[in-house]
């Protein structure tokens, strides 16, 4: 991740902080009591000075930049590059031309206009206490039990009911079987004895009974 991206994100914060903290339109202050080396001139760019940082700290945005004799030449405008190789640009003050400097010329800054580079590094994550695990035996178990109940109820009741149906149908079938057996017995008896007998000796009786039964049906 380039320092430019990180700085542009923090630039809003720094600009807001520096302008708010230092007043923005406050009366201009005189040169600082002391200055530190901040950067070395690389080349001009669209009227601005491009410098390579030679300080281990990061300058404030809009921080005044001086010569060694504490003459102000401009203010920090942009900060560029990765954290291990920082560059910055200087917006020149009125009457100062970027083309008037040579490569290697040094620029200075007040000590109170610097930030430690640690401010721009990601903070390590602090491991907190482990979160207690929720016991999942309550509700899901209840649902499982309820499901078992449903399974038991459905299986038992339907199974029992099905058995009942099977039993009743079986019984009914038995009854039908018994009835059929009865019919078989009756049929066998009647056909064996009665029917044979009727054909032999009760032929008139059969005709009479059928005639009588037919008469009964007419009523």
UniProtKB/Swiss-Prot annotation:
One of its GO terms (biological process) is snoRNA guided rRNA pseudouridine synthesis. GO terms for molecular function: box H/ACA snoRNA binding. Its main location: nucleus. Residues 143-212 are annotated as: RGG-box 2. The keyword rRNA processing applies. The keyword Repeat applies. It holds the Pfam family Gar1. GO terms for cellular component: box H/ACA snoRNP complex. Residues 4-24 are annotated as: RGG-box 1. InterPro entries: Gar1/Naf1_Cbf5-bd_sf, H/ACA_rnp_Gar1/Naf1, Transl_B-barrel_sf. Residues 1-29, 120-219 are annotated as: Disordered. Residues 1-24, 139-219 have a biased composition (Gly residues). It is found in: Nucleus, Nucleolus. SUPFAM superfamilies: Translation proteins. Keywords: Nucleus, Repeat, Ribonucleoprotein, Ribosome biogenesis, RNA-binding, rRNA processing. Non-catalytic component of the H/ACA small nucleolar ribonucleoprotein (H/ACA snoRNP), which catalyzes pseudouridylation of rRNA and is required for ribosome biogenesis. This involves the isomerization of uridine such that the ribose is subsequently attached to C5, instead of the normal N1. Pseudouridine ('psi') residues may serve to stabilize the conformation of rRNAs. The H/ACA snoRNP complex also mediates pseudouridylation of other types of RNAs. The H/ACA snoRNP complex mediates pseudouridylation at position 93 in U2 snRNA. Component of the small nucleolar ribonucleoprotein particles containing H/ACA-type snoRNAs (H/ACA snoRNPs). PANTHER family: H_ACA RIBONUCLEOPROTEIN COMPLEX SUBUNIT 1, NUCLEOLAR PROTEIN FAMILY A MEMBER 1 SNORNP PROTEIN GAR1. Belongs to the GAR1 family. This is H/ACA ribonucleoprotein complex subunit GAR1. It comes from Kluyveromyces lactis (strain ATCC 8585 / CBS 2359 / DSM 70799 / NBRC 1267 / NRRL Y-1140 / WM37) (Yeast).
């Amino acid at each position: 991740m380039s320092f430019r991206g990180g700085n542009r994100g923090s630039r809003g914060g720094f600009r807001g902080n520096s302008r708010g903290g230092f007043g923005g339109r406050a009366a201009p202050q005189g040169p600082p009591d002391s200055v530190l080396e901040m950067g070395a001139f690389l080349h001009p760019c669209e009227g601005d000075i491009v410098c390579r940082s030679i300080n281990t700290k990061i300058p404030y945005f809009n921080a005044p930049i001086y010569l060694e004799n504490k003459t102000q030449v401009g203010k920090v405008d942009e900060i560029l590059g990765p954290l291990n190789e920082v560059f910055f640009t200087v917006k020149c003050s009125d009457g100062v031309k970027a083309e008037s400097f040579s490569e290697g010329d040094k620029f200075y800054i007040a000590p109170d206009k610097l930030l430690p580079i640690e401010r721009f590094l990601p903070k390590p994550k602090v491991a907190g206490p482990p979160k207690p695990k929720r016991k999942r035996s309550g509700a899901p178990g209840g649902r499982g039990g309820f499901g078992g109940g449903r399974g038991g109820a459905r299986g038992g009741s339907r199974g029992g009911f099905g058995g009942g149906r099977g039993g009743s149908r079986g019984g009914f079938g038995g009854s039908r079987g018994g009835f059929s057996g009865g019919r078989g017995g009756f049929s066998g008896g009647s056909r064996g004895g009665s029917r044979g007998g009727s054909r032999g000796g009760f032929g008139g009786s059969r005709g009479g009974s059928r005639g009588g039964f037919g008469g009964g049906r007419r009523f």
